Regions:
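Amphipathic alpha-helical segments at domain termini/boundaries
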Residues: 1-21, 25, 167-200, 208-220, ...
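Helix-loop "lid/cap" segments that line or gate small-molecule binding pockets
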Residues: 161-162, 213, 231-237
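Glycine- (often His-adjacent) and acidic-residue-rich active-site loop
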Residues: 35, 46-49, 57-90, 109, ...
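Terminal peptide-recognition signature
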Residues: 18, 22, 37, 55, ...
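Crotonase-fold acyl-CoA enzyme core
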Residues: 92-205, 239, 244
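A general structural signal for well-ordered alpha-helical segments in protein cores
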Residues: 13, 68, 80, 87, ...
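Charged catalytic carboxylate motif
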Residues: 32, 36, 86, 93, ...
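Conserved CoA-thioester-binding segment of acyl-CoA-metabolizing enzymes
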Residues: 1-58, 92
Length: 261
């Protein structure tokens, strides 16, 4: 009997969609699910044909966090530490991936699922989406989710989420800065593809450099940040993508031709 894959991948015009595929368990991040995502991300990092990644969930939810049954079944300290290190590696990989990652969110995104949304570079949600760092309700402060959440939300809003575990709707998530856009459920596919297509139309080399700089400089003091940004600009100017883009502007062409880059 063929086993249903935990992660689905589809590729179209430089856009890769990864879909968490355990709908009967609300796409929980079991060890096996995280291993599947990690393998896919590692492969994508080396795939120059991929310009944008979309991360989605199958079924009624985006992701309901970790698999609590699996955690309780193997709750010794060594296993728990390994689980959260595995999760942390996956989250860091999302940030270090050369390609931008867009979370496509519907239904609930709770605990590590909310972390996943926060860790992605961009996020678009349907208006039926809900978000929570809900571990506090079962006696677990969402420590690893807090790393991503506190880097996306203002301090007071982040603390409210982390200390109450209460759900917020998509509108409030937008106001908090957790997501970029809210749309009707029937428009979610189009909204995500529209954003992905805009990004995919740009040159991948300078997008990758820009993403790397974005995350690196925000952890630095202002002088070091400007120094790194200056070097990135110099490197960017030497790319053929920049030469084509600037020449297209000077030639008054509608768009640069980055199709073969």
């Amino acid at each position: 009997m063929t086993q249903t894959p935990l992660l689905l991948r589809s590729d179209s015009q430089g856009i890769t969609t990864l879909t968490l595929n355990k709908p009967d368990k609300f796409n929980v991040l079991s060890r096996e699910m995280m291993a599947s995502v990690q393998e896919a991300l590692d492969n994508i990092a080396k795939d120059t044909s991929v310009r944008v990644v979309i991360l989605a969930g199958n079924g009624k939810a985006f992701c309901a966090g970790h698999d609590l049954k699996q955690m309780m079944a193997d709750a010794n300290e060594q296993a728990i530490r390994a689980l959260f290190k595995q999760c942390s590696r996956m989250m860091v990989t999302l940030t270090q991936l050369p390609q931008p990652v867009i979370a496509k969110v519907h239904g609930m995104a709770t605990a590590a699922g909310c972390q996943l949304v926060a860790q992605c570079d961009l996020a678009i949600a349907s208006d039926n989406a809900t978000f929570a760092t809900s571990g506090i309700g079962v006696g677990l402060y969402c420590g690893t989710p807090s790393v991503a959440v506190t880097r996306n939300l203002p301090r007071k809003q982040a603390m409210e989420l982390l200390l109450t575990g209460e759900f917020i709707d998509a509108s409030k998530a937008l106001n908090y800065g957790l997501i970029n856009q809210v749309c009707e459920p029937e428009n979610l596919d189009d909204a995500v593809i529209e954003m992905a297509t805009k990004i995919a139309s740009k040159g991948p080399a300078f997008i990758a450099k820009g993403k790397k700089l974005f995350y690196s400089q925000i952890e630095q003091g202002i002088e070091a940040a400007y120094e790194q940004a200056t070097e990135t600009m110099v490197e960017n100017m030497n790319l053929c993508e920049a030469q084509e883009g600037l020449q297209a502007f000077l030639d008054k062409r509608p768009m640069p031709d980055w199709s073969d880059r």
